């Protein structure tokens, strides 16, 4: 493949990322008009992210067959920071601030593609808007798809975005009502 073609592919990916950021900002703006309460918008962003995450888990596992089965939260954090977040967001992430016996940690995104082209008004943040909650919801959905129930919340602080993740339980497979083993 020639350098020109590779450069055009890289540029098209960058353009689609910028388009996504602008579209996301417009969507959040419309949601703020529709719901009026920024806390309700945060809840809706979380739900949307959760639905995306359940589908991204299948895509991630299909593309990354060499990822080992995670048995603890440190392994989950490692796979999220080294594989999943760079793959889908194109940014690096680190896990830190372990607490509650390794059941709670914070993932820090050094640059958040959702916030590159926007400035969220401080009054909306103080009223309960978590602009990047869709990312936290996607992580929650992806982990639930692989049978880990977690709570996730996002907070944008200047240049970084912090996603607090708290492990709740390992979910058991269950058959639909009326079906036997």
Swiss-Prot record:
Record-linked Pfam families: TRAPP
Signal peptide boundaries: none
Lipid attachment, kind S-palmitoyl cysteine: 70
Main location: Golgi
SUPFAM superfamilies: Ligand-binding domain in the NO signalling and Golgi transport (SSF111126)
CDD domains: TRAPPC3_bet3 (cd14942)
Gene Ontology cellular component list: cis-Golgi network membrane; cytosol; endoplasmic reticulum; TRAPP complex
Coiled coil: none
Record-linked Gene3D superfamilies: Trafficking protein particle complex subunit 3
Localization (cell): Golgi apparatus, cis-Golgi network; Endoplasmic reticulum
Keywords associated with the record: Endoplasmic reticulum, ER-Golgi transport, Golgi apparatus, Lipoprotein, Palmitate, Transport
GO biological process, one term: cuticle development involved in collagen and cuticulin-based cuticle molting cycle
Role according to the record: May play a role in vesicular transport from endoplasmic reticulum to Golgi. Required for the systemic spread of the RNAi response.
PANTHER family membership: TRAFFICKING PROTEIN PARTICLE COMPLEX SUBUNIT 3 (PTHR13048)
Oligomeric form and interacting partners: Homodimer. Part of the multisubunit TRAPP (transport protein particle) complex.
Family: Belongs to the TRAPP small subunits family. BET3 subfamily.
Name under which the protein is recorded: Trafficking protein particle complex subunit 3 homolog
Name of the gene encoding the protein in the UniProt record: trpp-3
